[in-house]
Design a protein with these regions (language model features):
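Amphipathic alpha-helical dimerization/coiled-coil segments
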Residues: 1-7, 28, 75-99
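N-terminal helix-turn-helix DNA-binding core of bacterial DNA-binding proteins
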Residues: 5-44, 66-79
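Short, hydrophobic-biased segments on the C-terminal half of alpha helices
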Residues: 23, 52-53
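Glycine-centered, phosphate/nucleic-acid-interacting loop/turn motifs that mediate DNA/RNA or nucleotide
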Residues: 59
Length: 99
């Protein structure tokens, strides 16, 4: 995912509330198993795995296997944390304007 074509794709995948929550969890916890994410969000492992696959295609996450254990992490952790912080700041500013 490079250049301007990647931006709409990234926005589309992060527009899914579950995917956005998964990214937040990964930003807070580093590498983590899909079952741990599923438990944290109260969804099935299958549903979380589908979301992780979409995030992988959008080049947001990557995974590593160790035996039968799969762990996911952010592909670009520093940049992703900056993006999450910028989105939080935008929401705060927009909320202040509405008051």
């Amino acid at each position: 995912m490079r250049g301007r074509d990647g931006v709409p794709r990234l926005c589309r995948v992060l527009g899914n509330p579950l995917a956005f929550t998964v990214v937040q969890i990964l930003a807070e916890n580093g590498d983590i198993r899909p079952s741990q994410i599923a438990q944290a969000v109260g969804r099935s492992v299958a549903r979380v795995s589908n979301v992780l696959a979409a995030l992988r295609l959008a080049e947001v996450v990557r995974y590593e296997t160790e035996g039968r254990t799969v762990r996911y992490r952010l592909k670009h952790p520093r940049e992703t944390r900056k993006l999450l912080a910028a989105l939080d700041s935008f929401i705060e500013s927009a909320s202040a304007v509405r008051r």
